[in-house]
Amino acid sequence: MDSKTLQTLRRDAEDICRSAIEASVPDAAIQRALAQLPPCQGRTVLVSIGKAGWQTAKAAYDALGSTIEQGVVVTKYGHSQGPIGDLAIYEAGHPVPDEHSVRATEAALAAVSGLSARDRVLFLVSGGGSALFERPLVPLAELEDITGQMLVCGADITQINTIRKRLSGVKGGRFAQLCAPAHVYAILLSDVIGDPPDMIASGPAYPDSTTTAQAMALVSRYGLTLSPQALDLLEQEPPKVLDNVTTVITGSVAQLCRDAAARAEALGYRTCLLTDRLQCEAREAGRFLSAMAGTHAGKGEKTAYILGGETVVHLTGHGLGGRNQELALAAAEGLAGLEAVVASVGSDGTDGPTDAAGGITDGATADALTALGISIDQTLADNDAYHALKACGGLVVTGPTGTNVNDITVLLV
């Protein structure tokens, strides 16, 4: 195992991930979508929500300027980059909604109230909107608790949103109803595999496609504890038809993977897209990739295996980390001694409740951790990948990126 080769592979893996994320920043795509809008005879109100909420609002404001009469931006703490004209900018809680989420949402609802059929709402949506944009129909403390239960049990984003859209006064198409009779032009940056519009930020402006039976089955499957009030709400169907909405999707994990492949090819790698629909336990994905490395490493041809999607973590410990860090750490043992690297990075720059976007490990990581007295198995059991990767230089830190289109994972051999 050559250390210089590993250094090159690590550098290239980070380069591929960072380049793909930079290419997915939505400015140009948002402006292209806005250019297709029909003329507005009345007022234009902007509402932009999500972890990319500031970036998408800035792109829209740069394109439309003073034609936007009023606007509200809701993004995650630390993701605002300053004023945008006279738009009202709020930061709020993610992945669990908080009182700032509710306050910001009420400001948005005030902005769209009383509009006429001549007016329009530009609704810019990115991942994270489910927590950031909220009018709870149960006490906020209970909604926070239910969200926490689903995050801990390993439910995927579609399952989580199936539950929480029924507990909200703005999700599942209800925001669009509150905008009526104004027309809503929804421009979506997708962070949900397969790009189902009703699941992106829990579909505030899209008809619901789920059923009460599905929601109740999730309660049973995961043993969720809900109040009688919440259970009653699960029995109520969100809107199934909306006649005042036009929806466009401008970015997705599929494009993120294509951009990663293009950068890998530019660096001289043969590329193989394994999937842009990765959905499984993070550590199982990491172990699978290390097994692939065992088969393909050292065969002569430089190859980049690319995956996109969103893994899950079933929390059993009380450590610190995120799904991308856990994936990378889980790969480390199987990579030992190989000229191979696994990098996994969240496109929004945030992986779990940490300051890292993801993690990177290689054929030397396992020995480095052993020398530090760190057990990979115990660390995974504790869900403490952050501290292990930090100790061996395996964290990938980008800061907020201005986009959010799932995660990018790369295996280089």
Tell what function each PLM region has:
Residues L329-V413:
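Internal helix-turn-beta structural module
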Residues G268-S344, G352-P353:
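Active-site segments that bind and position negatively charged phosphate/pyrophosphate groups
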Residues V74-A117, Q159, R164:
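Glycine-rich oxoanion-binding loops at beta->alpha junctions
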Residues A182-Y185, P207-F288, M292:
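Accessory alpha-helical/coil subdomains and C-terminal extensions
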Residues P139-T225:
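Internal gly/pro-rich beta-alpha loop/helix module
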Residues E91, V96-H100, L151-C179, D351-T379, ...:
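Proline/glycine-rich low-complexity loops and linkers
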Residues M1-V47, Q55-T56:
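An N-terminal, well-structured beta->alpha segment
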Residues A59-I68, D86-I89, L109, S113, ...:
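A glycine- and small-aliphatic-rich helix-loop capping segment at beta-alpha/alpha-beta transitions
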